[in-house]
């Protein structure tokens, strides 16, 4: 994966266009599909590919929880979980597990029946889109419905490469939701990803409410500059890979 990603970056550095890099990415995706058919011992390759192909479209939704029922008619979690795990173990996707409550220790609150899926390579996420959507994202910089999922994927990829196990929280019957969490000593740090430097209501609630005793401060990633206000550290999205070093 790292060699292939380097080839994409090198091509772009030479040509300053996406034509060559996109061709490389398309070939990587083609190779992935071939590997699925070749190495999916004991699993249905069609099911694995259906999950793989559906990741970008589920990230485009407002509710980014991955819904197996949307992958294929009659699809059920118990029939597809092995496919999801296969893709994760192959280094193709990243699983972000739901928490039943944002509290330490995180492992005691993980619910693997609910999760979000991100592509392990954000460039390949964009390459999976159709031609029109790719031109919107790459050329016109018009992210539209892809903005939230794309920025979340960028941050998720950086956190995983920094050794963070991904988890998120969505409170039932509420708008309270948090994209990621990070443990720093005895603190549980919520991490929210914003397309712009917008207000982070969920972050404020988690920090100020007495119902979340492990949470005292948080991090907000934005398409903007560094700042710190009301116990919220604001960072540009590109710096996500530095987060464990910054807060550790």
Regions found by a protein language model. Give the residues of each.
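Accessory nucleic acid-recognition modules appended to NTPase machines
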Residues: 2-185
